């Protein structure tokens, strides 16, 4: 059956996989009933995840999986899952889950292969229903996201935002308790026609009394940023798109340069975090030093669904005597990495040498540290990333049961200030590797005949506004008739910026396609200081342009930026749109308006200062060059992110170019580059983004 109904219209579209571009015109695509049935299914099975399914149409499939081996693509893998599950060793429903546990990781992968290898939608659908009622809830959510993101037949499926599927990982305990309290004492709560009545205000940790929660560390001033639900969801989706469980020819993640992208994602997170620190008059983050007691503690105010709080880490934290062997392993693995960088090569188990003095070897290096499936020898450095998180969480990799901290969940990792210190330490390995690569030559930087004459900006303004999230999933409902007839919202104050545009004037002797890259970073006094400050430049935009001979003027709006995505539609609202489409009452557009694969548009600018924070934008124009991988599957940019396609990025230049290598100032500054001084102003006036 055809998946899509094609209609000519003006639609919301994407310029690239990670961006939401509302101004592009092309042939829009609308979902047919088969597609909308799938959409309806996912929204319903994710409702009230800790309760058994109550939909009559699903209940017959909750008791057993599809056992017919002809219904699977790789039954040998599926049979392994069947045998494994029958042992009774699987994590029980209701227990705390983290992927950073050896047994849970193996079980998660087994469930994934079972569902991924379901040969058709009917088999997948029935097996997913069985898994919904029989697999641990945390594991189920993890596997459902993996299959939806990576099964080719589910391209374009939109899931509810992760912070609305599982609000426990995004909203502090007092919010959850207040909602349940109101529901307990007011049966009409959530059903009133006046939606304002159903709002609960959600505070950040820093707004609570410091002495009560012992949160005296200065990092708490950044809670509005580190606890931002969009930022934390962004990291979750990246770690799921490029899950370390997946790889090889079957998935083709290597086509997206996953190893290099792993480094770059964390570098950009650190750059953006440091810009926010500068906005709050704080110094840049320093690399973690494996010396105990560790000053940086963390007391999360999150709790798991059963009321168990996230495991905390005391200030001046000491590891147990039994954990020092992990520290020895981490230090040994790190020493191995430094040695192969210095040696300039790595010898694989079969004797093949990998030359680490080639720029493309960054791919090998990233996969090695991530210990993912595409690593040529993950055992060489063990699981340095995993064990580092566990050591800082007071947990064991092979424990029978876990009490996870914020570092042990993708959704909450960015909340813990030690995350940034840890990855700054990892990034030091990356910078050390890059030191051995030659600086870019004049020819590699210059674009003959292209001169950026000037760039002008609108006034850059940031502010806090209120945003509502649908957190109805924390309320247990007994009747499916009521599942989507009520809605409860958590209202939170979030950083935002006024949309802005910049205008670039370029003189060109060149005719053809080119790429413009844009970064925002700190203002520095001397040009030579760029060697130090370049790692704090955050890439906000990258786009393809057509040059004609003579003067070219490009106007770019912040809403069109390549790397960013807009806020998501709320769970209940989106479900109602799906049902209107399913019942034939209106068309359901397939576009990137619900994209998960990008940085929150609201956060592309740091907060700045009320008096104006001096910053710089950096631009570079480069010729358009062919991408390394052209043979990935042909994804549709109108409604998918293109993970595994090898077509997500415009060219094959290194991520972060030209700041990714040591700068030779003898010829670095070329005419196709431009630094623009700006000020970012912060206003205390609240801009209300309310639903009602």
UniProtKB/Swiss-Prot annotation:
The gene is HexA. GO terms for cellular component: extracellular region. Larval storage protein (LSP) which may serve as a store of amino acids for synthesis of adult proteins. Glycans are attached at residue 203. One of its GO terms (molecular function) is nutrient reservoir activity. SUPFAM superfamilies: Di-copper centre-containing domain, E set domains, Hemocyanin, N-terminal domain. InterPro entries: Di-copper_centre_dom_sf, Hemocyanin/hexamerin, Hemocyanin/hexamerin_mid_dom, Hemocyanin_C, Hemocyanin_C_sf, Hemocyanin_N, Hemocyanin_N_sf, Ig_E-set. Homohexamer. The keyword Transferase does not apply. It is found in: Secreted, Extracellular space. Larval fat body. Pfam families: Hemocyanin_C, Hemocyanin_M, Hemocyanin_N. PANTHER family: FAT-BODY PROTEIN 1-RELATED, LARVAL STORAGE PROTEIN/PHENOLOXIDASE. This is Hexamerin-1.1. Keywords: Glycoprotein, Secreted, Signal, Storage protein. Gene3D superfamilies: Di-copper center containing domain from catechol oxidase (1.10.1280.10), Hemocyanin, C-terminal domain (2.60.40.1520), Hemocyanin, N-terminal domain (1.20.1370.10).
């Amino acid at each position: 059956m055809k998946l899509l109904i094609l209609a000519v219209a003006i639609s919301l579209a994407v310029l690239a996989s990670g961006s939401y571009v509302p101004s592009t015109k092309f042939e829009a695509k609308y979902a047919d009933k088969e597609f909308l049935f799938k959409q309806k299914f996912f929204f319903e099975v994710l409702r009230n995840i800790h309760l058994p399914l109550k939909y009559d149409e699903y209940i017959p499939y909750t008791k057993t999986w599809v056992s017919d081996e002809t219904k699977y693509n790789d039954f040998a893998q599926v049979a392994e899952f069947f045998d494994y599950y029958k042992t009774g060793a699987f994590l029980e429903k209701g227990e705390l889950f983290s992927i950073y546990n050896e047994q849970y990781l193996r079980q998660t992968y087994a469930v994934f292969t079972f569902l991924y290898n379901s040969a058709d939608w009917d088999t997948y659908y029935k097996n997913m229903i069985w898994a919904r009622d029989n697999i641990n809830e945390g594991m189920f959510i993890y596997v459902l996201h993996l299959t939806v993101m990576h099964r080719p037949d589910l391209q374009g499926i939109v899931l509810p935002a992760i912070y609305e599927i599982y609000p426990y990982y995004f909203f502090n305990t007092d919010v959850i308790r207040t909602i349940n309290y109101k529901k307990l004492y007011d049966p009409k709560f959530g059903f009133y026609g006046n939606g304002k009545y159903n709002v609960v205000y959600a505070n950040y940790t820093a707004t609570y009394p410091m002495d009560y929660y012992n949160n005296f560390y200065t990092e708490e001033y950044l809670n509005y940023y580190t606890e931002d639900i969009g930022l934390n969801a962004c990291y979750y989706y990246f770690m799921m798109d490029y899950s370390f469980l997946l790889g090889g020819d079957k998935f083709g993640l290597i086509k997206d340069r996953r190893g290099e992208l792993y480094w770059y994602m964390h570098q950009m997170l650190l750059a953006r975090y440091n810009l926010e620190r500068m906005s709050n008059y704080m110094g840049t983050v320093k690399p973690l030093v494996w010396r105990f007691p560790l000053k940086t503690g963390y007391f999360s105010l999150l709790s798991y669904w059963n009321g168990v709080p996230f495991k905390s880490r005391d200030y001046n934290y000491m590891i147990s005597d039994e954990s020092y062997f992990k520290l020895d392993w981490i230090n040994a693995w790190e020493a191995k990495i430094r040695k192969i960088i210095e040696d300039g090569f790595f010898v694989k188990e079969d004797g093949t040498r990998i030359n680490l003095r080639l720029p493309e070897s960054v791919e090998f290096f990233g996969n090695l540290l991530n210990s993912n499936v595409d690593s040529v020898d993950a055992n060489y450095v063990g699981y340095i990333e995993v064990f580092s998180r566990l050591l800082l969480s007071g947990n064991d990799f092979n424990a029978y049961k876990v009490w996870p901290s914020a570092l042990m969940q993708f959704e909450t990792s960015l909340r813990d200030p030690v995350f940034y210190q840890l990855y700054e330490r990892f990034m030091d390995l990356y910078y050390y590797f890059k030191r051995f690569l030659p600086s870019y030559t004049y020819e590699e930087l210059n674009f003959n005949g292209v001169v950026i004459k000037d760039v002008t900006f609108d006034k850059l303004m940031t502010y806090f506004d209120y945003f509502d999230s649908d957190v109805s999933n924390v309320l247990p409902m007994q009747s499916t008739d009521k599942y989507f007839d009520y809605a409860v919202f958590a209202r939170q104050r979030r950083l935002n910026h006024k949309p802005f545009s910049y205008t670039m004037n370029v003189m060109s002797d060149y005719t053809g396609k080119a790429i413009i890259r844009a970064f925002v970073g700190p203002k520095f006094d001397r040009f030579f200081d760029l060697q130090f400050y370049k790692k704090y430049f955050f890439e906000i935009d990258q786009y393809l342009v057509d040059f004609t001979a003579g003067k070219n003027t490009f106007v770019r709006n912040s809403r069109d930026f390549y790397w960013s995505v807009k806020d998501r539609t709320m769970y209940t609202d989106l479900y109602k749109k799906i049902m209107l489409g399913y019942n034939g009452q209106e068309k359901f557009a397939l576009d990137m308006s619900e994209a998960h694969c990008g940085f929150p548009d609201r956060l592309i600018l740091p907060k700045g200062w009320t008096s104006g924070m001096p910053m710089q934008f950096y631009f570079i124009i480069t010729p358009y060059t062919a991408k390394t991988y052209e043979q990935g599957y042909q994804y549709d940019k109108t409604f998918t992110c293109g993970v595994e396609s090898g077509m997500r990025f415009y060219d094959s230049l290194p991520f972060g170019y030209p700041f990714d290598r040591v700068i030779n100032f003898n010829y670095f500054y070329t005419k196709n580059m431009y630094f623009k001084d700006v000020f970012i102003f912060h206003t205390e006036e609240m801009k209300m983004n309310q639903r009602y």
